[in-house]
């Protein structure tokens, strides 16, 4: 039996499973980057080592994802219940339109990683990589270390 896009049902299930595994791997990488950032802060100022360890554990336990129609939203929940979006992953090809002036009319690919504009909205000007292809296409973008937290989390002291 085939789906409306011509794929065998088994193929579609495998594709969804691969995307889920890629998102879970990305979350592990985000956690690892957060721990590296936390360790670099502890080296700079060793006064709050215990608090940084607790903070890193809370981050690890609070990061999760939610599957929506077009996106997979990756977000964190802190111990007070406050939530913040880390980013979005495109679920299927040709469902999200690129809004950049030079690329207008093109669609994002399945697995493309987008930054968050707000809680429910992704930044659709460009992708910062693709989790299925293991690429980070952001060398010329404003934040070249993304998703490395040494830049993203530089505001904490």
Give the residues covered by each predicted segment.
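Amphipathic, interaction-prone secondary-structure segments
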Residues: 51-107
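Short, non-transmembrane alpha-helical segments in secretory-pathway proteins
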Residues: 11-55
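A short, surface-exposed interaction/processing loop segment used at functional sites
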Residues: 100-139
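C-terminal partner/receptor-binding element of secreted or periplasmic proteins
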Residues: 132-157
């Amino acid at each position: 039996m085939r789906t409306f896009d011509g794929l065998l049902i088994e193929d579609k299930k495998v594709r969804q499973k691969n995307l889920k595994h890629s998102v879970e791997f990305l979350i592990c990488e985000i956690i690892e980057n957060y721990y590296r950032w936390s360790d670099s802060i502890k080296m700079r100022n060793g006064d709050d080592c215990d608090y940084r360890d607790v903070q890193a554990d809370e981050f690890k336990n609070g990061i999760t994802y939610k599957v929506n129609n077009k996106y997979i939203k990756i977000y964190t929940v802190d111990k007070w219940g406050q939530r913040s979006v880390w980013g979005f992953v495109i679920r299927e090809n040709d469902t999200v339109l690129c809004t950049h002036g030079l690329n207008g009319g093109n669609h994002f690919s399945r697995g493309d990683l987008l930054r968050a504009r707000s809680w429910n909205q992704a930044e659709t000007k460009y992708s910062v990589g693709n989790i299925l292809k293991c690429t980070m296409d952001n060398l010329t973008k404003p934040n070249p270390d993304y998703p490395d937290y040494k830049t993203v989390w530089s505001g904490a002291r």
